[in-house]
From Swiss-Prot:
Region (Disordered): 1-29, 441-467
Basic and acidic residues composition-biased segments: 8-22, 457-467
Function recorded in the entry: ABC1 family protein; part of the gene cluster that mediates the biosynthesis of the lipopeptide antibiotics leucinostatins that show extensive biological activities, including antimalarial, antiviral, antibacterial, antifungal, and antitumor activities, as well as phytotoxic. The function of lcsO within the leucinostatins biosynthesis has not been identified yet.
SUPFAM superfamilies per UniProt: Protein kinase-like (PK-like)
InterPro entries cross-referenced by the UniProt entry: ABC1_dom (IPR004147), ADCK1_dom (IPR045307), Kinase-like_dom_sf (IPR011009), Mito_struct-func_regulator (IPR051130)
Induction or repression: Expression is positively regulated by the leucinostatins biosynthesis cluster-specific transcription regulator lcsF.
Alphabetical list of Pfam families matching this protein: ABC1
The protein's name: ABC1 family protein lscO
Lineage, broadest ranks: Eukaryota, Fungi, Dikarya, Ascomycota, Pezizomycotina
Family of the protein in this entry: Belongs to the protein kinase superfamily. ADCK protein kinase family.
CDD domains: ADCK1-like
């Protein structure tokens, strides 16, 4: 029943009148506006920002932010795991050390391999001198020299097209890509023969019969490396600011040198320059070989050299194995029938010539970059093939001569000359750099009288005084920033890796004597003063003492009472490292096991 009130009009509920009082003819009822709570708006905005950042990071910055986030997350997880389950003061239940080290080493190694680039290079550096880490880490980090994860074939094609004006692989090399491996076909193999931190190597065989090693850079590596180096530079500057150590400019110096590795045209120039230098040395020109660079197939991100069949430096069985008369169905590769001492002598003399004679030093001599083959002219002797010429330093003549005098003073125990060179480098003490160069403690006889008194004084130190003393000692090691030659960082890296190679092969040569002899030869060739008869006798006695130490160690090794001179030096170094662990824990609050 309808009821009407005065002054009111009845309207149809389903079709209310419009603003002008007219009744609409039809249509649905208007829905009220939906009001979104503020926290939903914030969540939607956050999701949009995350998606936008991810797409920007992946397609513009090469995934650098994701890689950095993963690295920090893994390291934070490892640190938390040790805080929770390691040591007497752990926060939760204590876990067995082997299990704890194993799972965290696995986490770190997986992260390094996945991130690639400089992360993988860092893992290789730790693997070369990993005695500061637990045994589980050393085993895991040993895998860093295995083939790294390789780029997809589509990425390889994109890099070659971009660097060669849009031309395809068939147009550039004149051969078609193939999934088959072998030397009988004229192909460009899709599957890489080797994969490293910033590039991978494909084999190609041209119609004219030339075998090529085509090194193709990872597509996003230039963006990733620049970000990684920027992060490293910030950490270096932060450490310098916190501790007061004179190392603020080192981060930029290292970053500039490592960035050169991403320019393969620069690497090609380094390779050709090293080949020219070796050709001028009559003692090395037949014992060392640098693969020829093909400039017509080389660009900023593609390096093409001749293919050289050889074995890696650490493949002892292949180097020393008997030469097979012919390949059998079961033999993978016949031995070369070479002597390890012949190989390592060439390696040590090559890098010594770079440091003391040429001033142009290869700074990444890890075993993957050193191959060994039979000398084409004398098959019974070894020829070393040097690869990967991206990371070099150029020494000034002044620094080259100083470094030669530094090593002469080391092998002849000439403390006065050692301190004189160190002062020229802005160092307060030469002992630390002597330890690092020799890979063993360098004992300064003049300090022995004060040793007991200094030890007694250190027992009375407060934690703050001990921390300040360690900072002062580190500052003395690094020297005055304006005088300290930053090239020494890479020189010591070279020395350390060569020492590791010699130790792995069982110390076949007296490395310290060989380096010292090359330094003495360079000093004579440069005419840096004439030696008196007394100095000559002193030098010969010092070299003879090194020979006696080497042969005594070799004799013990032969009868099963040792593992060679380098291993004995390594044990002395390990004792120093144990002291360093305590110092690091005191200085930075980091427990290194």
């Amino acid at each position: 029943m309808d009821v009407a009130f005065p002054g009111m009009e009845r309207h149809d509920e389903k079709n209310p009148p419009g603003d002008d009082g007219t009744k609409p003819t039809g249509g649905k009822k208007a829905r009220p506006a939906i009001k979104i709570k503020w926290y939903w708006k914030g969540l939607i905005l956050l999701v949009e920002l995350c998606i936008g950042d991810y797409l920007l990071d992946r397609y513009v910055f090469g995934g650098v932010m994701l890689r950095t986030t993963i690295a920090y997350a893994v390291l934070a997880r490892v640190g938390l795991d040790y805080k929770l389950h390691y040591g007497k003061d752990c926060w939760l239940a204590r876990h067995p050390e082997e299990d704890l080290h194993h799972r965290n080493a696995q986490r770190v190694c997986t992260m390094l391999k996945w991130n690639g680039g400089l992360y993988l290079k860092a893992g290789q550096a730790v693997a070369m001198q990993g005695s500061v880490l637990p045994e589980e880490y050393q085993r895991m980090f040993g895998e860093m020299f295995d083939d790294a994860p390789h780029s997809s074939w589509s990425d390889v094609e994109k890099v070659i097209k971009q660097d060669f004006g849009g031309r395809s692989i068939e147009d550039v090399f004149g051969v078609a890509p193939s999934d088959q491996q072998g030397d009988s076909q004229f192909v460009f193999e899709r599957e890489p023969r080797a994969s490293a931190s910033i590039a991978q190597v494909h084999y190609a065989r041209l119609p004219d019969g030339r075998g090529l090693a085509v090194k193709v850079q990872r597509r996003e590596i230039s963006k990733q490396v620049s970000w990684d180096l920027w992060s490293m530079k910030l950490m270096t500057e932060y450490t310098a600011w916190v501790t007061g150590l004179p190392m603020g400019g080192m981060g930029q110096f290292v970053a500039d040198r490592v960035m050169q590795e991403t320019d393969f045209e620069h690497e090609a120039s380094n390779s050709e320059k090293m080949a020219d230098l070796i050709a001028t040395d009559s003692s090395l020109r037949d014992r060392v070989y640098i693969p020829k660079v093909y400039r017509e197939f080389t660009s900023k991100r593609v390096l093409t050299t001749e293919w050289v069949d050889a074995v890696q430096l650490w493949d002892r069985d292949a180097i020393t194995g008997q030469v097979a008369p012919s390949r059998s169905a079961t033999s993978d590769k016949p031995g070369l029938g070479l002597r390890l001492d012949d190989v390592m002598r060439t390696v040590v003399e090559l890098f010594s010539a770079q440091m003391f004679s040429w001033g142009f030093v290869h700074c990444d001599p890890h075993p993957g970059n050193i191959l060994v083959r039979q000398n084409p002219k004398r098959p019974d002797s070894a020829q070393v093939v040097l690869l990967d010429h991206g990371l070099y330093i150029t020494m000034s003549d002044k620094l080259r001569r100083q470094y030669a005098r530094f090593w002469k003073a080391l092998v002849t125990n000439d403390d006065a000359s050692l301190q004189r060179v160190s002062r020229e480098w802005g160092m307060k003490s030469a002992d630390a750099w002597a330890d690092a160069s020799l890979m063993r403690p360098y004992k300064n006889p003049s300090s022995s009288d004060d040793e007991s008194g200094e030890s007694w004084q250190r027992t009375k130190e407060t934690p703050e005084e001990r921390k300040q003393r360690m900072i002062d000692e580190a500052a003395a090691y690094l020297g005055d920033e304006g005088l300290f030659p930053r090239e020494l960082l890479f020189l010591e890296r070279n020395i350390t890796i060569v020492q590791g190679n010699n130790r792995f092969l069982g110390s076949p040569v007296n490395r310290i004597k060989l380096i010292g002899s090359c330094a003495l030869k360079a000093i004579r060739d440069d005419g840096q003063g004439k030696e008196s008869i007394r100095e000559r006798i002193s030098t010969r006695v010092a070299l003879l003492s090194l020979d006696l130490a080497f042969w005594w160690s070799a004799m013990k090794q032969y009868f099963g009472y040792g593992e060679g001179l380098e291993q004995e030096l390594k044990e002395a170094e390990d004792r120093q490292l144990r002291e360093t662990k305590d110092a690091v824990a005191e200085l930075f609050g980091i427990t290194v096991n």
